[in-house]
Regions:
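Anion-binding (especially nucleotide phosphate/pyrophosphate-binding) glycine-rich loop
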Residues: 18-116
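ATP-dependent small-molecule kinase catalytic core of the GHMP/sugar-kinase superfamily
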Residues: 2-12, 29-32, 97-182
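Short secondary-structure capping/turn segments at boundaries of alpha-helices and beta-strands
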Residues: 8-13, 20-24
Length: 182
């Protein structure tokens, strides 16, 4: 989180799992935003959108009414597995392609997602989730005091690590948490 890395810098290792968030964007003939996620929203004004991440990412890309966004995921929110960061990254990539016909780099994705979650929404989250979702694999990240993040892929070509990972198990405890309320 910024209050720590701005004083000390930081490091973290992330390991992504083979679970995904899917986002579909369609242009529609109505001057509305139709949003389908765990809820359904059908609004005319961007400021009426209840889902904060969707609202702010739409504002970031200056998307006007006439769009339908549908999302679903392999894992429910609140599992502690970085689903909001993964959703933010997926939505940013989908809207960049929709608006600009441009696929963003991993660095651009993680930077925009972090900006939306930390600076715009003021969520008490760190840089790890958007970066883990953007880069995938097993990564070592180094954060400077200025917030610059460098990544190093520590999985690629590491046979010992590959053997270790193939024997890991992920167990669903069915416990839920909200990182923004901790």
């Amino acid at each position: 989180v910024p209050f720590f890395y701005e004083r000390h810098g930081g490091n973290f290792i992330s390991a992504s799992i083979n679970k995904h968030v899917y986002v579909s964007i369609n242009q529609i003939n109505e001057k509305k935003f139709i949003l389908r996620y765990s809820k359904l929203e059908n609004v005319s004004n961007i400021n009426e959108i209840q889902h904060p991440i969707i609202r702010e990412v739409l504002k970031y890309f200056k998307i006007t009414p006439g769009v339908e966004i549908t999302s679903f995921a392999d894992i429910k929110s609140g599992t502690g597995l970085g689903s909001s960061g993964a959703f933010t990254v997926a939505l940013i990539q989908a809207l960049s392609i929709y608006k600009n016909s441009k696929k963003l780099s991993k660095r651009e994705l993680s930077k925009i997602a972090s900006y939306i979650e930390i600076d715009v929404l003021k969520e008490p989250v760190g840089l790890q989730d958007p970066h883990a979702s953007s880069y995938g694999s097993i990564q070592y990240f180094k954060i400077s005091k200025s917030g610059l993040v460098k990544n190093y892929d520590i999985y690629n070509g590491n046979t010992g690590l590959k053997n270790f990972v193939k024997d890991l198990y992920l167990i669903n405890t069915k416990k839920r948490r909200d990182a923004s309320k901790e």
